[in-house]
Amino acid sequence: MDNKFLLKSSLLLIMSGTLLTACSDNDDTLGQVLGTLEEEESQFGKANDVFTAAEWYPGGEQGTTTKASYSAVAPCAEQMGLETSFNKGEDFFEHLYTYTDEPRKGLGPAWVRSSCIHCHPSYGHGKRQTEYRANTIGNGYLLVVYHPDEAFTEDGVRYTDFPSNYIAEVTGMPQTKAMEPFKAPIDENQITITWKKVEGSMPSGLPLHFPDGETYELIYPEVNIPVTAFNTNPKPTNYEVRLESTIGIYGTGQLDAISTEDMKAQYAAEANYAQLNPRMWNTTAQDWAEGAYYTLADGTKAIKKFTYAMTRASLQDGAGANAIWNITNVTRSDRRYLYSTTAWAKAMSEDPEVINYIRQNGKDKSSLVHPYYADTDEKIAEKVFTMLDMNTAAKGGDNYTAAFGEAEMSDKDYYDFMVWHRGLAVPAARNLDDTTVQRGKVVFNKIGCASCHRPSWQTKEDNYWVDNSIKAYANANGLDANQILPKFSYQTIWPYTDMVQHRLFMENDIRTGWCRTTPLWGRGLSLRLTGAEDRLHDCRARNEIEAIMWHAYSKQSDAYSSAKKFYELKKEDRDAVVKFLRSI
């Protein structure tokens, strides 16, 4: 973890006339406290002609750290006395899961990664890869394998439109690792990633150089998985593959606190001038479409707000809460079933090598494959299929417990993990007193970037939804489940996202074309903290300039007008926008 203070000389923090204490971290050995300046010399936390005082604190007063870190605890979690749980939860994120070792046991039988931090280097955005290897730290890619519904823009860009459904033969987050003797659903050694370069000019007509002669490059990935790589029965047909990278985890608790009412107002406002995803917004009724609602585990309907595809509605049933189960295949009390497919279970039950291994090694009760053992090959095959096919609550539950034993992650451990997940702070903004940064903000707003990258939101009462596992932990300990996780009530936050999906129509674009506007807060620290600054959903943009210009690839891009205006800027104004983006 990087615990160095953000301020150039550990400037005194002034906010509403009071001294703010920097959030502490649990690894002070990496910290470096620099000398302080006289109070009157410090501009941190002070308003100027362009930035308000609040903008130094993008996560709000309760959700911002003054450390150059994506891993620091938020002030609200400290004030609630949750640091011990936060640090324990952090351990579940940072370290490897294994088959049998407490407390991170239960890996497999197939998995996407053996730890969370594999995909989130230093808690940040994944890094661009030239090959797909699940064990590579920094490989934040998830494989997206789907049946394409082909479409074209007016300027000839091919894209895949809704629904472009995921194939059924492998899990939505495909697994490329498995415990012996099982074979991973996809053999990653057969996956190829080829990076291609846009040549000449973009379909929109814009060349790959600015009017002043400065050049830039645009690259994009082409991913191939041959049918021979699938260890399933049946094997998929008519499919395409895309990559989706992880984004930073910090600040997700603050985003969870944005109210549905405020999101609805944002959708209604944008519907007046932009085409919105009809699965999310009914333009005729000026209201949520049926597809905007997500059914939570207790039957509650809530509006989707998380993931690129807007598939999750609550952080407690969102990407992280889901991933701690399906990335590792580690079960908990409310998910006593596997992340697997029937096609994989069938293929493994029909594989002679799998059956033979279990027959030879499974009789001993201490063997990892003992649960699959029986006295005949036919019965082994039957058990393999039945157990690997326990991929729903109906198939699993008590059946899973009878076959595999109790849930592998305790309710307390999961609670600690969610304290950490919700309690991550956003790093404070930097250099807002710099005149170039100030100029960058003015230009950013003037050319229309803030239309989608909405700068700020005001949270209301943070009445987070509670899942069954945390309810069980609270009930067992006489606690109020609605009061034991970090809350971000009544905070002004500056994530630079409208929480709305848009389309850019890039070459080899995201699966359905629709992608939620990614928050910009803290991204300027990525190179320093993770060693890379790759951007966009598949890391195709290696810097801010490339990310912006991908917005102008097609004239039908929702951001074409703003990106074209950026293209037409003088170099000093382009540089100012970049410096602004690196400062917020």
Model-derived features: positions:
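Electron-transfer interface patches adjacent to heme c in soluble/periplasmic c-type cytochromes
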Residues: 28-87, 96-418, 422-435, 446-584
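C-terminal motif of bacterial Sec signal peptides marking the signal peptidase cleavage site
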Residues: 20-22
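Bacterial N-terminal signal peptides that target proteins for export
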Residues: 1-10
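Bacterial N-terminal signal peptides
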Residues: 10-18
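Conserved short C-terminal alpha-helix that flanks the catalytic cleft of nucleotide-sugar-dependent
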Residues: 93, 443-444
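Short, conserved catalytic or interaction motifs in soluble domains
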Residues: 25
